[in-house]
Structures are given as C-alpha cells and as structure tokens.
C-alpha cells in the first residue's frame, strides 16, 4: 500500500509538472522526496495535486494519489482513507524483462 513505510512510487506534481517520489510514512499521509529545488518556490502560490507518473511501470500514469497544500510542501494528503480498507486484492505479475 502507498501508506506503507517502505513504499515509494514515482509521481508527477500538477499543475507545475515536476516529477518526484511519493513515500509512505506508515501514517495517514505520505511525503514528497527527491524533488527539484524549484519546487519549494512554486508551491507557495498554489495547492498541488499528486498523480502517478507511470515511470517504473508499476502504476498507470495519471492515477490521483493525493493533494499537497501550500502550507505544508512535503506532506501528501491521500485521497483514499487507508484505515477504511477491509480487503486488498494482490495481483502478481512479471515486469518486462523479468522471468
């Protein structure tokens, strides 16, 4: 799950178009990591929506992950409430090139 402490996925921050990594914290929110320095200046003026970027091939691009409010530039407020999950479906597949 994205909220898992060991989870990291490539994301894109819109409307500014910067790529970053969303990291789970083990809590009800995530954090932005590995983002360009210009990010801090751009987020001061607007709220940011976090989407999957599609890099790495694990998730399709454009899946909404959460929102970042300008008063806390590193915290992702997930759109999903992971505490409400009762069941999780696990799908196993091979990445291209893996056997």
Region locations from a protein language model:
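A secondary-structure micro-motif
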Residues: 1-99
